């Protein structure tokens, strides 16, 4: 049987000890699920949930006109098929999008003039086109105007209520001023805050502050209601000459020394003398035994307390004291009572006074003091006050003020807490509101103020805004939803105006709607939002990381300048949710993060991480996902805690964490355990082997630099990996996976044809054609190229790799190459992290990469006439046109240099008046060349290479040139070949099924020459053509029906195939949608091979970066005793200070891997000589260890084993997962098995002298990457070029073809050396002395050497500047005195 491809994969020796319970989730799930939810919200039963497109339409519609005689309702929406597929959009610079059709219903009412009753007069329904909705590609990106873009997820503060204080910064005394803020998803912010005098204020939208009682009055509360909401009431009963009887609070006395005797009101005995301490034991006795409930307190004890309710004269209705008034006694000079509210009440015979329970220790008088300071007393004045703050300068009326206040927080159109906000608010304030209530209500506001005053009283904690329970992720779907809502709201205004201005009876919904604002909002979001980014496509890892990025910047987020240290810092809740390592260096550090490997985003937008459940000290395989808030309640053990066979903890105390603190706990106190040791880092960091031995700063650089690795000509998976390389390659979409199981039918460089053997859906064709991308340009100009891995006849299973992409090798991520390195100094060439390389690297194309640049030219229709793409260019010699075809477009395969013409183009220029002679010549010869100028596309300076692809686009109705027709023919041929192959496989498939169906059956009738009733066998079928098989009618009805069904299926699939083909051909032949005014466009792709050269940047995976200093001949490089030459020489001093020791362990491990590979190679040579497989088996067992060997190779066929051994002769790949990988003993063991010294050092000889170096040197195999900072892209030189208009100095920078700046410090240097003439030259003729530089250029051309320096233009600019200030400067010659 044909070897299944699975058996050929390279097997890694896995060093991890901890069993993986959970598969790593799809790495770009964040993007996909979010956008799917947005687009498909209308499908299925959950449509009314208010999210996605459905939710947006439901929130904006129905739209009523101003006098409510008509209403426009939303019925449903539907996304149609996109016009072009992904590839076509990329080629044609279009946006990959689907038309959005919305069904709207217009209802017109009849309104009865007299009664005002409404009756339905007319209902019209119609589908309306609402612009295009961009679609996400299979890899989680968007194609916008032909380029791939990614929408980055944003971290923002979760809606809800937050409590905080100013850390004592506001007031000079350092007093903590508490504040509370209600943040909605959209709408006005509401703040409550204390000032230094302990009065509570409210602010709306950060405006001027109002006393909080004003807000409470506006909510319809009165003074008594406010007091009742915030304070308990205590009654004081007056007993003549004895004092007051009041309730006893034993808890408040505990541990204090009262200033008065405590007297039990019931018995009259003194239970505690003044100044004595109340011990807890006494308090317990009073509660339990004596059961004292009331105390008798001295008379003056009530003075200074506040009345809880209005106390009214029942007969006259006169209010004696109002709620919140202070009880006072006023004395005259002699100490006689002369007034005060308390005297007034006692005089009126009131002995029972309800008082607010404010003791200034446990409960403070903040709300009561605020009320006293507030000049408003009722709802109307409070509303007017709020109106004045919100709309300063407008005259307030009660009605307007009331409307404004209602719309601020209680109108679902203007204010939305969102489900998250409501859930967070319920949790923080212990409310039980349903999460469908998205606006505020009175209880919410009262509860917030209550919680704030309790904070001031010392109860409760403030919130930590950097806690991941208070920050949430907004992914693509949600960002898009908000943007679309903005567009629809803009549209709504226009619809309302139009509804009231037209004759509503006669029009359809289509006429009311102008979808431009909605479409524009979407386009603006994808084109220019801060979160819509040009995809980083350098390699597959950079793509995956870009899609998993979390940014705190962007609209509605932070700004770099304002973000403090706290926001950027690593927080305990980041564990398993956001990577603590991977973040940019520079001003964005900590603001842009990466999602951890196992993390996912829940429906509320909080990041969750998985844990295994622990039940009574035993670890189970149940996995639960937890958000940061839920995790606070649990005790979590680390993944590397030691377990026995049954999954119980081995030690008595286990390192664990709870609520952000680390502690040691006994096994039975533990609820959860981490799923995997790598769950706390991101994808890029988990690709670094021996990460645990690296310093964090260097690990950060390592993670970031892996994303800049350039795809090389030959990829090479690392010997020392971490085991997740295959996952990254799979999820990035770089490698091609089989969609379903099948057998390989055809393979060539551009496509793989698979005959499917499993059906995923009935009726789909039994053929999969995988088109490979060949030498396509990525966003970063690196090369995307896919290569098949399978042979004809191979059996593939679903989800298996059939082709490698850029930076992948056998389906594993391969960013660099394994090279032999030595850590030693070499003549100072590796000073300061420089790298010395061997010429072998250039000779064998080890680090050679292909870069593809795209150049385009458009022929427009100008005022003076159309531009033309042609070979006929004025004043250009035949030599310059050697690479162009008759249409004026460069050939594929031409080698081009800077300045070469790629596409010839001429532009008409303005007519100049002609002399009579010219007119005569023009009339005789029809000479036209004089009135056009050459505007051809030329290769810019510094670029060179080979033309690999040319595309020509024509406008509708413009005749195609020969080149365009040729490209079109090739494209149609390719499509036809695809169709024919698919048809051939389909026929083979169907006819083989038909044969098995009819074989051995009896034919009732058939084509000519077949007798009725004859048995169908091979001989009979061979006399007929395959098409005639269908004409054999079978006797059994069931069989006949089956044949008929098969025929139907065959015909249907054939029709579908033809239809698809016709459709594609029609698209190819149709003209292209070009921008207005463009008649024709040509794109030319130039590829260049870049070898490694001095000045290029390289790096390892541990943050060890360096620049190449020199290329040394192979024979001069240091070599080992067996004659192996070293490829790279690195500086050993780069290791100790940087503390990234992981690279040394990697070097040793790689050396062992190579050694074991050599042993396998020798065993294979033995086998080829002797035919005995034993040495190969032994070598494989030595390399992989018994366990892996038995599992992977134990039951293999011999030729399989030989093939698999042949794949690892260069080095045996190993996997050492982060935080759970090989330790030092494992490295020693690997070196020993490979037959090397356990020190990892070797005797090395000098290549130039052949002498041995003084001491052994660390030599090993290391995985090194070539980064995207190539010297070819940076080096640039200018002789003459463009000048700045004002100063006439040369421009700066490579892009402008600028010069080198000679700044003031350089001038000082030349002055210091007294180089007067050099200095004069630099400041005049080489810069901005216009006349001088022209003369100098002339004299150089003539070969003379005289020039004179004049006045620099910048001096004239200075003079003009001074004159602009009103000072006239005149310059006099020295001669003129």
UniProtKB/Swiss-Prot annotation:
Q: What does it catalyze?
A: RNA(n) + a ribonucleoside 5'-triphosphate = RNA(n+1) + diphosphate
Q: What EC number(s) would the UniProt record show?
A: 2.7.7.6
Q: Name one GO biological process term.
A: DNA-templated transcription
GO cellular component terms given for this protein: DNA-directed RNA polymerase complex
Q: Which one Pfam family would you cite for this protein?
A: RNA_pol_Rpb2_3
Whether Cytoplasm counts among this entry's keywords is no
What's one GO MF term for it?
Answer: DNA binding
What's the top EC group for this one? Answer: transferase
Which keywords are on file for this protein?
DNA-directed RNA polymerase, Nucleotidyltransferase, Transcription, Transferase
Return the similarity comment. Answer: Belongs to the RNA polymerase beta chain family.
Its job: DNA-dependent RNA polymerase catalyzes the transcription of DNA into RNA using the four ribonucleoside triphosphates as substrates.
Report quaternary structure and partners: The RNAP catalytic core consists of 2 alpha, 1 beta, 1 beta' and 1 omega subunit. When a sigma factor is associated with the core the holoenzyme is formed, which can initiate transcription.
What's the protein called, per UniProt? DNA-directed RNA polymerase subunit beta
Native source organism of the sequence:
Cereibacter sphaeroides (strain ATCC 17023 / DSM 158 / JCM 6121 / CCUG 31486 / LMG 2827 / NBRC 12203 / NCIMB 8253 / ATH 2.4.1.)
Gene from which this protein is expressed = rpoB
